[in-house]
Curated annotation (Swiss-Prot):
Underlying gene: ERC1
Designated name of the protein: Glucosylceramidase
A GO molecular function held by the record: glucosylceramidase activity
Keyword terms: Glycosidase, Hydrolase, Membrane
The keyword Zinc is annotated on this UniProt entry: no
Amino acid sequence: MTHPDRSAHDLNVPIQHSGRWFQDNLGRTLLLRGINVCGSSKLPTRPYPGSTHLYDDILFWDHRNVSFVNRPFPLEDAHEHFSRLSAWGLTLIRLLVPWESIEHEGPGCYDEEYIDYLRQLIEMMPRYGIKCIIDPHQDTWSRFSGGSGAPGWTFEVAGLNIKHFKETGAAYVHNTNAVPGDPLPMVWPTNYTKLASCTMFTLFFAGDTFAPHRTYQSQSIQQFLNHHFIEAYRHLAERLSDLEAVLAFEFMNEPHPGYIGLDHLDSFDPIMNLLFGDSPTPLQSFALGDGIPQTVDVYIKSWPFPTKKSHDRVINASQTSAWFSGCVWKEHGVWTVDDQGVPRLVNTHYFSKHPKTGEKISFYEDFYKPLVNRYVAAIQSVKKEYYCLVEPLANEKPPVYNEHDHHHNVIFSPHWYDLDSVFYKKFNARMTHDVQCLQRGGNVFSATYFGKRGAKKNYRGQIKNIKEDGLLNMGEKPCIMGEVGIPMDLNNKMAFEDDNYENHVHFMDAIIYALETNLISFTLWNYDVFNDHEYGDHWNGENFSIYSVKKSEEDYMRHDDGNSKLSKKHLYDGGRVLEAVLRPYAAKVAGTPVSAEFNIDTLQYTFSFIPDCKGSTTTEIFVPYFHYGNKTIKTDVSFGRCSYIEEFQTLYHQYELNDPLPKLVTITMGILTTESANSCSVM
């Protein structure tokens, strides 16, 4: 039996696609697995180490003089991290590159030092069989509106004063609020209902429609922002165009419509929006930003609904303005102040109907797709082979693509989390809820599942719906789940004390089971080299990393044998929930995948495919040393034969072309036990 000269998960192959499947140059179907690198890349490294629990009254606001060099990690550490990820079979990296990291100094001023660093980092990837996706990452628009992404100067373009966001309630920024008594982590997503974030997204996607009178340097704000965003990533694409490891550019992480499409402006829908902590209505946000104090509702965590109103409080008693030159929405007649000084809505439907025609607005059709088409065309003008990943709005179906849209090498790339467990930071495998079902109008009884099997059924169904929505709305395109993962600080961080990650393993196993049984490629969230138990991923209280430097130090000391940190034994130091993450998967398939399933309890993996590949008869399955090292592998195959090379962590399945081909080939793999000693085995 002949063997390829590389491992199953080595992606040093040309990657093309046919319909919904990625393929290599031999026509084999590729199922890609990888990781986001990394959460702390949302923050600069200079002038002081970026972390949202840190604040400097001078340096934090000096947003033009920052650097993201060494995000995600210094070049001298790259060998360690790439070696580890390759050994873990996670060879597709979604590389976070926020707009701010490229163009923080000012419009058109690119940080070539940082881009040089990225080039050197990406140049190393082929040695480890790694490819990457460039992710223009953002959360709630920018660091200065409580998230990450856009440069600070974009607020100046819109006329907003970032130093006044706290007093006016325009944004909740952890850096400026990191004192005892403030709301717990997970308050950051509420910025999607706050003035700063909503205004910037509205101007970015639809400023020409909803704010045509507000300009910057004699240009509409929308066109100014769109031009610089697209040009920044087109410039990056040019600088990276000769690097074989760059597979794709994403359009935008978790895009948001801002105010676009809101049917009314006197409240937010609590089913579609997280109300937590201070929760001003859109009208109250307008008034607060314009220096008018407001009494706003304050929400706290509850059950079965995520939050409930606890009390209210007065915001902006100082009558501070968030604007340099007046509220853009008052200027455009959305609201006014009556003779008694009370804010009043003039047109509560302003953002749901076109201001001139009165026609119903569609965010996807009128604003999102046209900009995505422009971006994709710009990126592929540099290199037509680049894939471009397009993400739907969070927890919503994707846009419907028609013949006028840019289809070439466009990939559907949704995200999915168990929002219930992420918000409460609890999981015990006894009960889970289908938040997707609830958001689509289901009731709490039909959306409740019990036990580990129930969790798997719950998640599998949700992922199936997302996949089918993509195929229906965007057409026969591959799907990469761009983000999916679990918080590691579950259940009051008990695992950090007793090192018992059993619940975490069940949680992650149920999620990856849902992905593998739906035959979806994915990049987990996330691998962060700065993760520790106290501050997690160092961004807004999140702690998702499957690697922790704190745990790495403890693991290494626990079984220090004098060998290198990169020896087989130590490559797993620092890993969290690896029992669930590291699992077999058919990476290169000589045909069309039909089904896949891994049993974490028995370590049995079953994979079926239709043997219809014309260019190769070899299927390659990643077999993690973590589970199967120094053990005898047992295989049962319905057709063909198998061999296993432990050094490559790969099980090879082959058949002869001149043999009569069956309709389906099934491969079952596990560990040889005394009970199964009579079965076929490979060493």
